[in-house]
Curated annotation (Swiss-Prot):
SUPFAM superfamilies in the record: ACT-like
Summary of the tissues where the protein is detected: Expressed in stems and siliques.
General function of this protein: May bind amino acids.
Record-linked Gene3D superfamilies: 3.30.70.260
Gene (name only): ACR5
Organism name: Arabidopsis thaliana (Mouse-ear cress)
Name of this protein: ACT domain-containing protein ACR5
Record's note on what induces expression: By dark.
A single GO molecular function term of this UniProt record: amino acid binding
InterPro entries assigned: ACR1-12 (IPR040217), ACT-like_dom_sf (IPR045865), ACT_dom (IPR002912)
Domain of life: Eukaryota
Length: 456
């Protein structure tokens, strides 16, 4: 059986390589045809998931997709993307342009190469251990997790943490404090898993939430972080309505995405219409969700030239059928809304840049805690000997952060180290009777414990 399976996989790979040789992928980058955007055209043989790979390449370069026209019905894949850089200008950096050509073109390292489809966006490494966490969102969770890892002589090299509807998900890359390499001792890995599991369990008492999950594994089989966070949230069913009505989100100042799904019976398509506030990586989040739910995007039109984004998808199941029932239709709508909202972070954006050291993340979250700040989302990166961390913060009641509080924190951490980016968002506090919803804040007074989740 193993021989047969191996033979089958090798044949599929050889067939894919033959198709690429006969019809190699083609990428054209045009900076002349449009005044304000760079136009990227991609043609290739079609394959399920290719659209996601292309969108991922563009979003990982921090490019903004202003418009897109997608056609991948049948055996050919043809896309046009109008993109700008982070500053809203045409993409003129030749290093970036060459990376796009290499990643989307006929090169063997291209996302169209069969060997690269499952690894794009993943840095194969044995230099760190991957920790995946899901559980109930509650006050002080991040600080407690960081404290446990520090006590276990683990250094957090990179991390990303999301919260949504009283759920928390995190993907952390950690190393041994002494050797700065991956942790391989089975007993130590088991201890890390066990103690982190205890921390995650601490906030679920008395509420109807799923059991927390902790996974500690080698980085060799690591999934792209954004994909994994979506999958962790999806597996924890954050798209379901929990004990409070989903309409409460409007009362908390959130803007609910407008998503509709209908069938075009004459052509056996289902049409997905999305209207919501535009933001970075929005297209990736929606395309990933549809792909991960085993839908094929046959045609699509994307318009995000203004503050609102409009997305229209013509989809089918991988078996060629449209959405088959009202229950399935509602599930697609719920899952897309959840995917859009998971990455949204209201609050004041803080960026920390300083020399990296063991325990830095623990110290920073402790300072936030001592000043009664709540972090709604965090991204931790290490580049060389530098730590580059981003936090979205609010005060304990969900209101805008007081300027004096921020300045006090900057005095402690260092004004050149901690920078304020953007302004506070206007947001209402969560209802008093909603489930606890701060992943990261630890409050000075226990009287704040019953405040609810403030997210959007």
């Amino acid at each position: 059986m193993d021989v047969c399976l191996s033979y089958s996989y090798n044949m599929d790979d050889e067939i894919a390589k033959f198709i690429r040789r006969v019809n190699p992928p083609r990428v054209v980058i045009d900076n002349e045809v449009c005044k304000d955007v760079t136009v990227i055209k991609v043609d290739s043989a079609n394959k399920h998931g290719i659209l996601l790979e292309v969108v991922q390449v563009l979003t990982e370069l921090n490019l903004t997709i202003k418009k897109a026209y997608i056609s991948s019905d049948g055996g050919w894949f043809m896309d046009v993307f109008n993109v700008t850089d982070q500053d809203g200008n045409k993409v003129t950096d030749e290093i970036v342009l060459e990376y796009i050509r290499k990643s989307l073109g006929p090169d063997e390292s291209s996302c169209f190469s069969p060997s690269m489809r499952s690894t794009i966006g993943v840095k194969q490494s044995v230099d760190y251990t991957v920790v995946e966490l899901t559980g109930t969102d509650r006050p002080g969770l991040l600080s407690e997790l960081c404290a446990v890892l520090m006590d276990l002589q683990c250094n957090v090299v990179n991390a990303e943490i999301w919260t949504h509807r009283a759920k928390a998900a995190a993907v952390l890359q950690v190393t041994d404090e002494e050797t700065c390499s991956a942790i391989t001792d089975p007993e130590r890995l088991s201890k890390i898993r066990k103690l982190l599991g205890y921390v995650l369990t601490g906030g679920s008492s008395g509420r109807r939430f799923r059991e927390p999950k902790t996974t500690v594994s080698s980085a060799l089989n690591e999934t792209h972080t954004d994909r994994k966070l979506h999958q962790l949230m999806f597996a924890d069913r954050d798209y379901d309505e929990w004990e409070n009505n989903v309409d409460d989100e409007d009362k908390c100042g959130r803007v609910i995405p407008d998503v509709d799904v209908s069938n075009l019976h004459d052509l056996d398509y289902s049409i997905v219409m999305i209207k919501c506030k535009d933001r970075p990586k929005l297209l990736f989040d929606t395309v990933f969700t549809l792909t991960d739910m085993n839908y094929v995007v046959s045609h699509a039109s994307i318009d995000a030239e203004g503050p609102q984004a409009y997305q229209e998808y013509y989809i089918r199941h991988t078996d060629g059928s449209p959405v088959k029932s009202e229950a399935e239709r509602q599930r697609v709508i719920k899952c897309l809304k959840a995917a859009i909202q998971r990455r949204v972070s209201e609050g004041l954006k803080l960026e920390l840049c300083t020399s990296d050291r063991v325990g830095l993340l623990s110290d920073v979250t402790r300072i936030f805690r001592e000043n009664s700040l709540t972090v709604t989302r965090a991204e931790v990166k290490t580049k060389g000997d530098k730590a580059l961390n981003t936090f979205y913060v609010r005060d304990a009641s969900g209101y805008q952060v007081d300027t004096k509080t921020i300045e006090s924190i900057r005095q402690v951490i260092g004004q050149t180290i901690l920078q304020v980016k953007g302004g506070n968002t206007d947001a209402k506090p969560s209802p008093q009777d909603s489930p606890t919803g701060f992943l990261f804040g630890v409050f000075k007074s226990r009287s704040f414990v019953n405040f609810g989740l403030i997210r959007s």
